[in-house]
Amino acid sequence: MTNSNIRLYILGFLAFFASLIQNIYTPIIPRLYDDFQVPLFWINATVGGFIFIVAVMQIVLGRSIDSRDSKKVLLTGLGIVIISSFICAMTHNFILFAISRLFQAIGCGIIPLVTLTLLAKLSTDNGRAQAMANYQIFLSCAPALAPILGSTLGARWDYIGIFSFLLVISIVLFLIIFFIDIPNVEKGIVKLTEKIEEKYLIDKVFITLVTLGFLIFLTYFSILVYLPTLLNNTYDIGVGISGVLFLPITVSVILGSLFYKRLSKKYNEIMILRVTITGFAIFTLLFGWL
């Protein structure tokens, strides 16, 4: 295996790790409620706030990523994760825990953006498709493994175990990135974000699609956040098992992506969208009623 391939796999694992950070502690939300003795709303707010900050970082950093030192930016992101993970693991104060978790989101937002940019630069024209496919596999695996890993660690060592685990992994990755050669992305070679023309902001189709995407992900993450509490309070399912029950949701998302590739070759995109939205609404209502 060449040094270039090793770098590609390291970058892919960095993207996996960033997604792991985001999803790993969702299964222990009921336990956090007991640990910190604060309203469940504030526990859930750390989940929503984390995702919001990650999204903002993509917008803020995406415009200038090409002109920055890639290695320094990656080390900065990992450094933020190290500091915040240490504080989250050590503190018993919810305010400090929440601030550190939201601070962690900044590092989590930096890592995947830089890794994607570097993957596009380091891979050759012939190998770029394979590199992007591997990147997508890493991203797809994280939401599937994170709840299981989080519930396993959380059941035994609570949130301290989860953030200690993140601390150790982030330190190892920091040292690896520090000692390997990471090239800079030359300005203008890779452009991840295109300027959105003003006409799109008043286009009804564009606004409709963005709104639909927002509502779908709002529902998706609402269910993810609510599921641990539902399983614990209604069905008396412990943290150790609840993480496994996240797996069907993640697998369904992956299968949906695979099915779309096949369906798009046979059916019109608008028809697929209509059927998908209708089915999503029906099954969401069934989830609430049943």
Name every feature range the model reports, one short phrase each.
Residues 37, 69, 90-96, 236, ...:
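Helix-breaking motifs and short loop linkers at transmembrane-helix boundaries and internal kinks
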Residues 56-92:
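Conserved MFS/SLC helix-loop-helix module at the cytosolic interface between two early adjacent transmembrane helices
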Residues 59-69, 256-268:
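Helix-to-loop junctions at the C-terminal end of transmembrane segments
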Residues 84, 95-103:
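Paired small-residue
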Residues 100-138:
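Cytoplasmic helix-loop-helix junction between adjacent transmembrane helices
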Residues 133-178:
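Helix-loop-helix hairpin linking two adjacent transmembrane segments in secondary transporters
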Residues 208-246:
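Extracytoplasmic gate region of multi-pass secondary transporters
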